[in-house]
Amino acid sequence: MEYLLFLLLFAGFLTFLPRFLIYAQITSSTTTTTPVPAANRRTIRVGVAAVQTTELDSIGWPMSGGAINMAIQKLRDDGFIAPFDFEVTVNYTECDRSLGAAVGMEFMRTKRLDVVIGPPCRDPMEIMATMATYYSTPMLGWGLVTDSKFTDTERYPYLTNIMANSLSLGFSLVKLLEMMEWDRVALVYEESAQDYPLSVINDVETAINEYDTFAVNVVVKQALPGGDLNDAQYISVLNRIKLRCRIIVSVFQTAPTRRRYLKMIDQQGMANEEYVHILLGLRSIGFGKQSAGLTKCELNCLSSGLAPFWDIAPDDGLNDRLKQAATRMLVMDLSTDVPDINYLNTFTMNCGAVVVNPPVSCATPACINASTSPPSAFARSLHDVFYLYGLAITNLYNQDPAYLNDIDKINGALQLNFAGLTGEVSINANNSRVPKLMLYALNDKYDQASFMNLTYSLNGGAVSVSLAYTNEASLWYWYGGKRPLSVPVCGFAGTDCPQSFVDQYGALVFAIGGVLIFAMLFVITCFFYVMRQKRLERDRIDAEWQIPLVKLQAPPKRDKERMSKRSLQSGPSNITDTSKMTFDNTFSNYSIFYLDKEPVLSTAHPASNLIRTDYDTFVRLRKLDHENVNKFVGMSIDGPEYLAVWKLCMRGSLQDIIGQGNFSIDPFFMFCVIRDMAEGLKYLHNSFLHVHANLRSGTVLVNESWQAKLTDFGLGTLAEEKKPMKRRQLWMAPEVIRGTLLPHQIEKSADIYSLAVIASEVLTRKEAWNMAERKDTVDEIVYRIKKGGPNAPRPELDMDGVEINHNLLILIRDCWSEEPADRPSADVICNLLKNMMPKKGNLMDHVFNILEDYTTNLEVEVEDRTKELTAEKKKADVLLGRMLPKQVAERLKQGQTVEPEGFDSVTVFFSDVVKFTQLAAKCSPFQVVNLLNDLYSNFDAIIEEHGCYKVESIGDGYLCVSGLPSKNGNAHIKQIVELSLDFMSYCKSFKIPHLPREKVELRIGVNSGPCVAGVVGLSMPRYCLFGDTVNTASRMESNGKASHIHLSAASYTLLMKHYPNQYNTASRGDVIIKGKGVMETFWVFERNNQFMGVSSNSGYQSDKKATNNGSSPESTPPSTPPMHEVKANSPVRHRKPPSPSSPTLSKRSVSPIMEAKARDIHNEETEALYRQFRRQETLALI
């Protein structure tokens, strides 16, 4: 016995262990939100009117209260309510009105709590919601409070209900009945102490009575008794329904009562294809139920994550049978789609356990024992309503903490949308939940599936339906794909089956039908044969002008030369005869395609609905044939836009020829072009078109024989524009511009006006109205033309010395007359032009003579341009040679890449103007620029004498190099030394014009060694040096002295090896160089007169023993400054050198060399900082 007891206790421990682990994880979870200081935190006092023993499985506090703790933890995990703490006060109303009033007085009057979560029962909620209105306290509703009365914002302005009201459920039901044409229903509901199912049924009945577009007859309204002892009464109610109705609407509060109903209808034979059972609910569970234990649904669970309500454990043998019966049931409920199924499972398994935790802290025995119980039916609603409140106060606090004391602000902040445990929660402006109902049914896999989405508008009362199926037969899968009828075909008793029509009139119908079918088949066959012949003929004709888009091939693109971005060489010049037309400069208003390897022109038009008349027009357009009318090839209408295809005229449009101005047009050519246009217009006016309606110089093409041809005509609606381009109105007649005529009402006289404007372009050889030289804008000219009158503007006929028949000018003026009736017809114009013909001859011969003259002039012009190009190229080469070394520039000009090149031995020269900052401070910016320009111009001349290369000059700094890019053996050291001495010599004689007392002194540094040089950059390429040799030369300059030439050991060694005794030099001694350590450096003072043959008066003297004569240090003149000495005005301050007799200095402790090194270290660091500051100040001054 003891062993059995131990096994039971161990099994209980194993059952509780997973629950404990998950709970521990929840209670220990932390958020990453920023902690709020204690002074800024606020405690929200929450009052909860709960029930402890009433309706325990539905709304009982021990099985529901944990939802508040779960909601608080969820809010904190999601980053909300960080500045808040919660104090929860719970009082029990037990769904009693009087207790509800007492609790309401305590919460709202005595304690003045911040928010009250109302009782989950209808009667006490009505009392407390009224009190909340009086005391202006926000109140939250959940549970069994679905009555439509709670949506009345005048009575309950401060009530926010998370539950959808049952009246919206009723209207949605009636909408479903209307769609399915079910006009007879039965209403059944579960008996309940709180009358929740009855209140839902009452609202449903109210919706049925108020629905005015579809009448529904409620044949039975009956409560279904509870308890197994009342089966006989239960069966009696179902039998009444069987005799009166097939559509049964039911409301149940709990899953067991739903299962019992399913069991009873199966026993009574009401679970077949004749019956439809519509189950109503507002709990977001559909066909599901709350888990019976603490484990989540593992087997036979629905897609919503819940177990089906017909499944019980252990199985009583009816689970499978009742599952089959459930296929005859539809469920209308709030959406069961919960985005976070994992959190739903966590909530289900932990809601009962956390009720004992703060701030809820329920310590009753029922709460303590609830840890092993599932949450109540409406616990998820309590969770969502508290989560909604937490979101609202967080938003208000973030806006202004004072808003938490404003009841209207709180009320407005509660109007939120979020995804909760009861589905998608949306609170509208009335602080009521927008009901988003779903119609669920079982699919072929016995799984819950949604087939409709019904949304009820609380303002207008309308129900919008969104179908989740494409074929209604999928909804009735278990009914054989057919919708059940409200009244069976054979009546409710099965005795009223009507006699079929076939039985009554079958023989007669078959006889008459056979004759009629034969006659109809004959007529239809004849009709389709005739229609097919007509269609084939029509298709054959239409195929002549219809051009498939795939047959229009774009012309091949011409190859373009690509130049290397590293090459500076000029590309070859391609000079061609400008009289040769190309596709790029000839057809600015057209597109070029190849059709069957022949080039054609096309104009694009927006796609529109073409009618048969348009097709006939295109057929007739193809038949138009005249030497002055361009050939219409066809239309392409199978692309995104329509393309009208015309024959190609290689010379282009008349507008482009005149605009380019690259051809000399003489009077004979002008006359021929005007005559061709008139002949073409005459042909069109006498054709079926009667008018061109789009005539301008851009629609006049010129072919190879210089023959003008009219194009872009007769396209009807394709050519019409609702708002033509302003510039095109320059060719339009005044009556057309005024907009008084529709496109099909344009007369021939309008074309005559356009012809006159084009003629003015031809005669003046300028664009229409000469807009390039006119001060008037297009809008101003169009306005004056539209205004009309005797002084209406017209194009100028300035012939510019060209002799034209005066009668032709008179004819043009007559053609653009203000009155359409005064304009001559095309026939008259052609006759007059014939009489005015200046001479007879071939236009092509005339044009060829003009082209020969033009070619001669072009050759002369090309030769002049070539000379100019050669001169400019020489200038560019000179400029490039100044920017880069000649060898590098030549390689770049030839298109060759300049790779970086290494040099084994070069000499680098750095110089800097001493005290340049002080000099710049005494000068204006322009004087500084002039000073540097004068100085560097002479420096550049000295550089050219010595064959060195100037790399760059920045401010007062100067960088030169010898030994690259052309190698010169070891001569580079001598060239740099000579250059340095000449620089020093020049600076002695250089005078500053505006500062005659000031002198320019240089500090020069020289170093020799290997180096790498190369071109850097594309837009402004520069020849740059890289390597430690350059850095060391810069250090030689920065560590040098004014008017001294400072050599590194490498340069000195090279100089002495290849040019010994040619220069007076001296060792400076060991100097600490930044980045290099201790280095021995040298001075160069002057040329040696014995070997160079040139006297030197430089006056330089050595601090150390001279290397050319071996003199001792005692022989150094006293005027030679010591190594550590600095100018008096130098910003560097030095301590006074200690006396040789000082007791702190001994021959062993401090040597003269070490003393000089110490002073040089101090000098180097301070002088380097000072030089950097001086350069920045100089650049700022410039």
Curated annotation (Swiss-Prot):
One of its GO terms (biological process) is cGMP biosynthetic process. GO terms for molecular function: ATP binding; GTP binding; guanylate cyclase activity; peptide receptor activity; protein kinase activity. Residues 1094-1164 are annotated as: Disordered. Pfam families: ANF_receptor (PF01094), Guanylate_cyc (PF00211), PK_Tyr_Ser-Thr (PF07714). CDD domains: CHD, PBP1_NPR_GC-like. Keywords: Cell membrane, cGMP biosynthesis, Glycoprotein, GTP-binding, Lyase, Membrane, Nucleotide-binding, Receptor, Signal, Transmembrane, Transmembrane helix. PROSITE patterns: GUANYLATE_CYCLASE_1 (PS00452), GUANYLATE_CYCLASE_2 (PS50125), PROTEIN_KINASE_DOM (PS50011). Glycans are attached at residues 91, 369, 430, 453. Its EC number is 4.6.1.2. Residues 1142-1152 have a biased composition (Low complexity). GO terms for cellular component: plasma membrane. InterPro entries: A/G_cyclase, A/G_cyclase_CS, ANF_lig-bd_rcpt, Cyclic_nucleotide_synthase, Kinase-like_dom_sf, Nucleotide_cyclase, Peripla_BP_I, Prot_kinase_dom. It catalyses: GTP = 3',5'-cyclic GMP + diphosphate. Residues 907-1037 form the Guanylate cyclase domain. Gene3D superfamilies: 3.40.50.2300, 6.10.250.780, Nucleotide cyclase, Transferase(Phosphotransferase) domain 1. Residues 562-849 form the Protein kinase domain. It is a single-pass type I membrane protein. Coiled coil: none annotated. The protein kinase domain is predicted to be catalytically inactive. Belongs to the adenylyl cyclase class-4/guanylyl cyclase family. Guanylate cyclase involved in the production of the second messenger cGMP. This is Receptor-type guanylate cyclase gcy-19. The gene is gcy-19.
